[in-house]
């Protein structure tokens, strides 16, 4: 199998085997039913993962987690991604919403929401995207108005994975109508029974069977108990939450791409053209080699970003966001490219449902768009790099290595 354990600890290698055993136990019919939209949400999959103690790996043991590092979660997510990015997303949702609860939640919130989330007893969803804004998060139009002891929430979120079935939602609403977006938003935990309406379940190219919905809040009332973090402090929560959102997407993309590539490699040894296996043709075999190298490079970047996230948990001055953005952008782009190559390798049969390549391809397309499109990732990366380069440097100034004449004559900046 195309995997690489040189980046992993002994415990993480053992975890990989645990997750592989679990993945092998998943009924293939579940994947087919999800793709036919015959399943609202893979609830039993989550419960089985919880029973195997594979949910919420990073969270404290007192809430049902295993207190493992980010690198361990990357290992698990790559293996779950083998099933496709739909189930990878389902698995990752516990990590994403759980992060907000673990990092910013109160003791009551952790007990009420985090413990049953990790235990597979409650389903969650996160509401970010709105009809008028996806990447422009701070332009949110959902409002939360304080009336007495209650917050009254009005607005809607769309493209919410698990929106149809979730027991509770982590949503962001504007709490200061006059303030700038980054100082005017507050997160809330809203339980479905509080009056959340599911108004549409979307038909999607991929990621089917996920109950992806538009959810509407009409005078939904919550108390301060359900507020996450400080009033108008949503930017702090959001910026932190982008780490689990993007890292989980990156790791899942590697697993999904690896699956497609492995299928194509096996096929290329059996399929013959012009009297020989198609793997004999260098045009094909060189592309396979390039894809393997790119997946290894993507994995190395994902693990580097995960180590940065682990370091940030111990030392607040560490900021992992640039590396996380790089990992999400690179891994999902390479994932999409790799699955396309797998389909091309298999020719016409790769385009049919005889093999799962076409499903994996449809799933992988979304990964380059959600949790911040890859164009947004590049904006974030360049911003961080230019900001970093503006600081005093202790490195050798390589620009001074040119000949004196060239320095004076050729280096024109304006």
Regions found by a protein language model. Give the residues of each.
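Short Ser/Thr-interspersed hydrophobic loop/turn segments at strand-loop and sheet-helix junctions
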Residues: 53, 76-81, 173, 190-195, ...
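Short Gly/Pro-enriched turn/cap motifs at secondary-structure boundaries
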Residues: 132-135, 159-162, 178-179, 204-211
């Amino acid at each position: 199998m195309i995997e690489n354990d040189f980046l992993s600890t002994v415990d993480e290698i053992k975890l990989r085997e645990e997750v592989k055993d679990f993945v092998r136990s998943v009924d293939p019919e579940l994947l087919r039913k999800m793709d036919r939209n015959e399943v609202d949400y893979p609830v039993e999959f989550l419960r089985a993962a919880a029973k195997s103690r594979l949910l919420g790996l990073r969270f404290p043991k007192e809430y049902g987690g295993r207190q493992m590092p980010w690198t361990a979660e990357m290992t698990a997510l790559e293996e779950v991604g083998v099933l496709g990015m739909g189930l990878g997303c389902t698995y990752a949702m516990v990590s994403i919403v759980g992060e907000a609860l673990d990092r910013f939640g109160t003791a009551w919130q952790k007990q009420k929401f985090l413990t049953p989330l990790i235990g597979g007893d409650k389903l969650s969803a996160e509401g970010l995207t709105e009809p008028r804004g996806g990447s422009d998060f701070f332009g949110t139009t959902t409002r939360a108005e304080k009336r007495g002891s209650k917050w009254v929430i009005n607005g809607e979120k769309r493209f919410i994975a698990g929106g149809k079935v979730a027991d509770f939602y982590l949503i962001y609403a504007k709490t200061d109508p006059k303030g700038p977006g980054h100082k005017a938003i507050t997160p809330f935990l809203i339980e479905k029974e509080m009056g959340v309406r599911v108004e549409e379940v979307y038909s999607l190219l991929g990621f089917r069977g996920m109950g992806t919905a538009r959810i509407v809040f009409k005078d939904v009332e919550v108390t301060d108990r359900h507020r996450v973090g400080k009033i108008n402090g949503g930017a702090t929560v959001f910026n932190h939450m982008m780490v689990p959102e993007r890292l989980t997407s990156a790791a899942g993309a590697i697993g999904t791409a690896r699956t497609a590539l492995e299928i194509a490699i096996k096929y290329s040894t059996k399929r013959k053209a012009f009297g020989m296996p198609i793997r004999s043709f260098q045009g094909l075999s060189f592309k396979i080699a390039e894809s393997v190298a790119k997946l290894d490079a993507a994995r190395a970047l994902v693990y580097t970003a995960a180590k940065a996230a682990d370091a940030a948990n111990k030392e607040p001055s560490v900021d992992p966001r640039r590396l996380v953005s790089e990992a999400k952008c690179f891994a999902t782009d390479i994932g999409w490219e790799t699955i396309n190559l797998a389909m091309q390798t298999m020719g016409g049969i790769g385009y049919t449902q005889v093999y799962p390549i076409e499903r994996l391809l449809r799933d992988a397309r979304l990964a380059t768009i959600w949790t911040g499109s890859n164009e947004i990732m590049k904006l974030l990366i360049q911003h961080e790099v230019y900001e970093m380069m503006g600081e005093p440097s202790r490195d050798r100034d390589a620009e001074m290595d040119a000949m004196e004449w060239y320095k004076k004559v050729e280096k024109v900046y304006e």
